[in-house]
């Protein structure tokens, strides 16, 4: 289901409102698991199922690995979506096609659509998706809208329960170096860290 607030005559949030919304969502807390991202993407028409992925995990080196792989794919003629973190200057760096960041207009349109679904989810008894889950769903939505041939994305910090693990069309999975940083976040013992990725 393709829905655009611009097609209905409604006014989408502006960039500042979008950033305030994401900041507010960060105060809602986290419920471990994939239930929220799965439900949000279902309501968006499961955009991730129409995409192919190179999925990169690890403690260090994910960004460099993503840059190498996406540049190679782009040079080979693919329309490459990139989902990265952290950002250096601008929030829109998180979601790129080739070397072009998502525009403020597309970001706001996507977040407006997602916000409506999140509000409906809460009304239906679901936990509100986290900022990372919203960003991940936004990336999937945007890359499908822009018809990317392949998406290169980094995991977050959630191990098996990371929102990016919703994808089922991974073409290549890449492990960069793995350290102990995830232990404090996921509350795993040292020997469990690698098996949880």
Labelled PLM ranges:
Residues 180-182:
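Conserved Switch II/interswitch segment of TRAFAC-class P-loop GTPases
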Residues 174-175:
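Conserved beta-strand/loop subsegment of P-loop NTPase cores
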Residues 10, 34, 39-41, 46-49, ...:
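ATP-dependent carboxylate-amine ligase catalytic core
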Residues 56:
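Hydrophobic anchor at the beta1->P-loop junction of P-loop NTPases
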Residues 64-79:
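A conserved segment at the C-terminal end of the G1
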Residues 186-193:
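Conserved small/polar residues in nucleotide/adenosyl-binding loops
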Residues 6, 13-50:
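Positively charged, low-complexity intrinsically disordered leader regions
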